Amino acid sequence: MKANPPLAWHPVPVSAPVNLRWWLMHQESLTRLLQAHCEHFRVEPVFQTLATACIDELEVMNLRRQNQVLVREVYLRCNETPVVFAHSIVKKEHLRGAWRGLSRLGNRSLGTMLFTNPLIQRTPLAFKKLKPHHPLFERACKQLQMRPINLWARRSLFILLRQPILVTEVFLPAIHQL
């Protein structure tokens, strides 16, 4: 048995480059942090539909493979350059509960909603170096001119009224220019 199975997410981004580790470890709103580091910030929605979760999301969300979730994917852009690919999933039944406004966010930041509601609790961050075979790597690279060898990502659960949403943020190469 391997010590670090390929699906594993880790509590510390040990092998991440030092200049990226600062972004990865930031505990507050990534939206606010990006807004502070660029002149023009915007959220570009690219995908939102009911689908099945990625295989490494099933356990953390207490899902079965056939369960439907709302998948929302956006690029966070600084000065029109994509710097983060954000992917969130929430159980379909929770769209009628705690997360009922999620499907209508459009180009508004999910982070703004998550960090302004004092009832929302966040679990500790988990980290992973995504390789080309990971589905989020593939989707994150769609708007990149050159595909990197790997991409670092972080994720955590945000819980409102015992109903979780899993938010994964994939850091794109342009983050190094901020």
Curated annotation (Swiss-Prot):
SUPFAM superfamilies: Chorismate lyase-like. GO terms for cellular component: cytosol. Coiled coil: none annotated. Its EC number is 4.1.3.40. InterPro entries: Chorismate--pyruvate_lyase, Chorismate_lyase_/UTRA_dom_sf. Its main location: cytoplasm. It is found in: Cytoplasm. It catalyses: chorismate = 4-hydroxybenzoate + pyruvate. Removes the pyruvyl group from chorismate, with concomitant aromatization of the ring, to provide 4-hydroxybenzoate (4HB) for the ubiquinone pathway. Belongs to the UbiC family. This is Probable chorismate pyruvate-lyase. It comes from Nitrosomonas eutropha (strain DSM 101675 / C91 / Nm57).
